[in-house]
Amino acid sequence: AAVCVVGRACTLRLAAPQSRHRSWEDTALHNRIDLLRPDAPALAQRGPHPVGVTTLTAAVSDTRQLTVEVWYPAAKGTVAGTSYATLLRDGVTPTVLHGSACREAFVATGFSAPLIVISHGYPGNRFLLSHLAESLAGQGFVVAAPDHAGSTYEDQQAFGVTLLNRPLDQRAVIDAMEALTGPLGDLVACRRVGLIGYSMGGYGAMIFGGAGLAETALQHPRAPEGGSLARHLAGSKTHAALRDPRLCAIMPIGPWGNGQAMWDADGLAQMDTPLFMMAGTVDDVSDYAAM
């Protein structure tokens, strides 16, 4: 037997418990990222566009490549439904997410779609906010979410790798999207870019958005060896060169770092990119009070 719960825009079928030993394949069938609560607010409703998805590669350097998932408004008549094979937080256990995008769908035409980059936490992966990515694409945005090398569930390297590379990765994704040709390149408008960063993604967004690091950041016990983090110091030529006029707004969600002396008042005062910050009152990792 099963219980059928009808929401505003979806039907959720809840299987009656039959066994305490369900396989992960069975459990995965319920991992839907496109369900809406009956009381979902207006901005959470599905947009007017069907959604396509594709996978690309962005080059940060000759030795650093990022796998990037890209969601986009698709052509009218696109049939919804795709799955995303991914891993749980342990980096070993496979799972599958089910959404409403269509893999390699024809691209919508007739308008320009602003770009939004979604940057995951440490660890995480490009599917961490895939529910948000599908929703934004349905509203008319192109959304690019990278796997940050050295910072994913299956590739979790020293924390300093993330401290150094996160804002560099974020800019590289914009560069890769701007270099696209063909229908998707015609659709995406990289002169208007928003950046959503979760936790360490928010740390990167703060730096990329204008808040250069304080000298105390170089003394953090998990900072990369050799002083390479100095390239992000407030007032440095390298941090100034990182700034990007294409970046129009940032949305850090629980950004890590301010409670770890990564910034000071002078560095934060350099932030001139429009910012909308989200934080949780019981966040004891990024530290709500510090945010």
Report each predicted region and the residues it spans.
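Residue in the alpha/beta-hydrolase core beta-strand immediately N-terminal to the catalytic nucleophile
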Residues: R192-G194, M251
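Short beta-strand/loop motif that positions the catalytic acidic residue
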Residues: M271, M277-A279
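Conserved alpha/beta-hydrolase "nucleophile elbow" surrounding the catalytic nucleophile
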Residues: H120, G197-S199
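Domain-level recognition of soluble alpha/beta enzyme cores
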Residues: L14, S19-I116, A289
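Short alpha-helix in the alpha/beta-hydrolase fold that links the catalytic acid
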Residues: D264-A265, T273, S286-M291
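Short substrate-entry loop that stabilizes the transition state in hydrolases
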Residues: H98, R103-A113, I118-D155, Q260, ...
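Acidic beta-to-alpha connecting loop that harbors the catalytic carboxylate
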Residues: M200, W256-G257, T281-D284
